[in-house]
């Protein structure tokens, strides 16, 4: 199949066949929050200016890949009649917002999103629908009358891989890829990653420094398959999360970003977390991690998964700890195993598992300035020291693989010993754990389970590349997923900036996904504004990394915006920006009138000192001289 076959047809599409009467609803017990949810619905349905949702059809009608089409104004051709214009073609951008930004879709959070992948999963014929939940805790929650008013009402029976010859079945995208199968998910991703580049008129781009990465000019379904088969990329798509739109994480693809949300014992609610999730995906979050540690973790997660168009990750040890009333020493393999099954049956797409925290590494943290800062890492370190043996995450790792391959849950192997300050970076504990994660990666791959590796943390700029180089070496090119890293510790309230500096660098060096940091990092639970600020900051970092790598087509949006800037097409400048609302707001603070949107100056320079206007005059003068 050629690229024209993959993504030549753009259509508007109505993926939700609900009527407008099915407006956004909230749980009946929460009527007091109706107004806020309706406000959220208006925010989500409000299409960005000059934009429309389009769907690119693949090789079959049920492959409809969403993108945002930005319409651009024409450019007046200088020196000729005012009726002469240069047409600027529409620009297409990657879109993570799901049907929430489709004006034709009726959104009902109580019913969840359409099951985009259900048909693909079903047609493979290697899964079965269970009679009911098989997790003891899941069953107990379903019978708990006290939480009935919190529960998502439309829960399907879970799917699981069919057994093969008496052995546990395998339905991972890695399993298919290694058998030469190109799944609909892989074709969907190829269209999504390519972003209609074959229609771009300006592909001028500086050569990047790839540090060994290799991305072809056009990403094909076969390239996606080969990268997944090699373990260099993952497609986090649990079979029980059919609502999710396929995406890929790997250093030969666009750098992705993850947004952390979740309640705590001190704040937030199910409504607020769902609102944060939809808000984060609107602004570009490729993945969401639910890090809830407060009340109703099970119910919160169900609402998030059923309404999320992007993969959802969790740290299962958090909920397991809740089940033993916060006493880490009381954790057992049986409790953790049941938690994994509970979450896999809900549809969690990837688990952070801190299996690399070994007993021998814990004493190495004694001399650290900030000790063990990972919540999961500290929990497992406490368990190991109390019981004086290796954690059940490590000793039962193959059992965990057996569970995950039945649902296609990917590993995000957690860096439980990551540094919490610059002083502790790149020490023996951190790198010892990383080497162990490399060994566990090979075990997971033996089971055809997808793996990515988590990384730091707090690292000075001159020490960042050492992290990337070692990860590639000991983890055999498995995707790296890092929290920043923060490049200085002196800026609480601005750690979205301190970390974005490190994120841009490590993304350039080869990290596949960046975990965002909000301005509230180290200070408190982020609200919706903080979530947006973190997302936009990390979209900048990820894009800067793509540019530095020379990712094909990465510079096209920069070129389009720069052209609009030089031609004083103010509306196009706003609309091509990562955050059109803020760009327009800042411009209009001093030049609010409609006439100012065609002015050949801004309030920075005024009408007489605009360098771009002067440059245009110089060019016109030069043309006149040449004509003579």
From Swiss-Prot:
Bias regions of kind Basic and acidic residues — which residues? 19-37
* This enzyme's EC code(s): 4.1.99.17
Which spans does this entry mark as compositional bias, Polar residues? 1-14
Question: Annotated region Disordered: where?
Answer: 1-37
* Top-rank lineage group of the source organism: Bacteria
Pathway in which this enzyme or protein is active? Cofactor biosynthesis; thiamine diphosphate biosynthesis
**One Pfam family recorded for the sequence:** ThiC-associated
Question: What reaction does this catalyse?
Answer: 5-amino-1-(5-phospho-beta-D-ribosyl)imidazole + S-adenosyl-L-methionine = 4-amino-2-methyl-5-(phosphooxymethyl)pyrimidine + CO + 5'-deoxyadenosine + formate + L-methionine + 3 H(+)
For this protein, what does the record note about how its cofactor is bound?
Answer: Binds 1 [4Fe-4S] cluster per subunit. The cluster is coordinated with 3 cysteines and an exchangeable S-adenosyl-L-methionine.
Q: GO molecular-function annotation terms?
A: 4 iron, 4 sulfur cluster binding; carbon-carbon lyase activity; zinc ion binding
Keywords annotated in UniProt? 4Fe-4S, Iron, Iron-sulfur, Lyase, Metal-binding, S-adenosyl-L-methionine, Thiamine biosynthesis, Zinc
Q: What class of enzyme is it?
A: lyase
Biological process terms in GO annotation? thiamine biosynthetic process; thiamine diphosphate biosynthetic process
Residues that, per the record, bind Zn(2+):
458, 522
* Residues where [4Fe-4S] cluster binds: 602, 605, 610
Q: Does the keyword 4Fe-4S apply?
A: yes
Cofactor section = [4Fe-4S] cluster
Q: Which residues of this UniProt protein bind substrate?
A: 260, 289, 318, 354, 374-376, 415-418, 454, 481
Q: Name one GO cellular component term.
A: cytosol
- Which PANTHER family does this UniProt record tie to the protein? PHOSPHOMETHYLPYRIMIDINE SYNTHASE, CHLOROPLASTIC, THIAMINE BIOSYNTHESIS PROTEIN THIC
Purpose: Catalyzes the synthesis of the hydroxymethylpyrimidine phosphate (HMP-P) moiety of thiamine from aminoimidazole ribotide (AIR) in a radical S-adenosyl-L-methionine (SAM)-dependent reaction.
Question: How does this polypeptide assemble, per the annotation?
Answer: Homodimer.
Similarity section: Belongs to the ThiC family.
Please report the name of this protein according to its UniProt entry. Answer: Phosphomethylpyrimidine synthase
């Amino acid at each position: 199949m050629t690229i024209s076959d993959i993504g030549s047809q753009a259509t508007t599409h109505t993926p939700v066949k609900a009527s407008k009467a099915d407006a956004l609803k909230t749980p009946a017990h929460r009527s007091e929050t109706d107004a806020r949810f309706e406000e959220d619905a208006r925010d989500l349905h409000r299409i960005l200016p000059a934009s429309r949702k389009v769907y690119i059809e693949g090789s079959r009608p049920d492959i409809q890949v969403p993108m945002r089409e930005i319409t651009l104004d024409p450019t007046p051709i200088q020196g000729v009649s005012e009726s002469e214009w240069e047409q600027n073609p529409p620009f297409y951008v990657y879109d993570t917002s799901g049907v929430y930004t489709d004006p034709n879709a009726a959104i009902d959070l109580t019913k969840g999103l359409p099951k985009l992948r259900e048909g693909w999963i079903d047609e493979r014929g290697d899964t079965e629908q269970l009679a009911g939940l098989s997790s003891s805790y899941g069953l107990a929650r379903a019978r708990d009358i006290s939480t009935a008013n919190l529960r998502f009402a439309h829960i399907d029976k879970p799917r699981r891989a069919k057994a093969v010859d008496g052995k546990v079945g395998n339905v991972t995208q890695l399993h298919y890829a290694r058998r030469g199968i190109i799944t609909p998910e892989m074709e969907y991703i190829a269209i999504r990653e390519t972003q209609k580049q074959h229609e771009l008129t300006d592909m001028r781009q500086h050569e990047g420094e790839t540090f060994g990465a290799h991305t072809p000019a056009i990403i094909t379904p076969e390239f996606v398959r080969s990268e997944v088969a090699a373990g260099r990329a993952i497609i986090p798509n649990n079979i029980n999360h059919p609502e999710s739109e396929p995406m890929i994480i790997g250093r030969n693809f666009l750098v992705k970003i993850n947004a952390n949300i979740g309640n705590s014992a001190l704040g937030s609610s199910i409504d607020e977390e769902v609102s944060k999730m939809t808000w984060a995906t609107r602004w570009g979050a490729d993945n969401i991690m639910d890090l809830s540690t407060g009340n109703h973790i099970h119910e919160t997660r169900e609402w998030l998964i059923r309404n999320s168009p992007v993969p959802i990750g969790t740290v299962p040890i958090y909920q397991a700890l809740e089940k033993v009333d916060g006493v880490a020493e009381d954790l057992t393999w049986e409790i953790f195993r049941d938690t994994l099954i509970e979450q896999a049956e809900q549809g969690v797409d990837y688990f952070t598992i801190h299996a690399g925290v070994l007993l021998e590494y814990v004493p190495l943290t004694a001399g650290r300035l900030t000790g063990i800062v990972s919540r999961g890492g500290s929990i497992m370190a406490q368990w190991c020291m109390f019981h004086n043996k290796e954690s059940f995450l490590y000793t039962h790792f193959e059992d965990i693989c057996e569970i995950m391959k039945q649902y296609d849950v990917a590993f995000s192997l957690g860096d439980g010993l990551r540094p919490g300050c610059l002083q502790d970076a790149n020490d023996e504990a951190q790198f010892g754990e990383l080497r162990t994660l490399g060994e566990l990666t090979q075990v997971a791959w033996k089971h055809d389970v997808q793996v990515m590796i988590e990384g730091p943390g707090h690292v000075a700029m001159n020490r960042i590349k050492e992290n990337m180089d070692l990860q590639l070496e000991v983890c055999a090119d498995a995707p790296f997923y890092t929290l920043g890293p923060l490049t200085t510790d002196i800026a609480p309230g601005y750690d979205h900036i301190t970390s974005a500096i490190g994120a841009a660098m490590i993304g350039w060096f080869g990290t596949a996904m960046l975990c965002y940091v909000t301005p509230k990092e180290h200070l408190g639970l982020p609200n919706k504004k903080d979530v947006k600020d973190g997302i936009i900051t990390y979209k900048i970092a990820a894009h800067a990394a793509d540019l530095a790598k020379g990712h094909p087509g990465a510079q096209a949006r920069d070129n389009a915006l720069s052209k609009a800037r030089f031609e004083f097409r103010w509306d196009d400048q706003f609309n091509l920006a990562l955050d059109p609302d803020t760009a327009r707001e800042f411009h209009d603070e001093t030049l609010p009138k409609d006439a100012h949107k065609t002015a050949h100056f801004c309030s920075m320079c005024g009408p007489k000192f605009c360098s771009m206007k002067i440059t245009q005059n110089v060019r016109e003068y030069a043309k006149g001289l040449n004509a003579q």
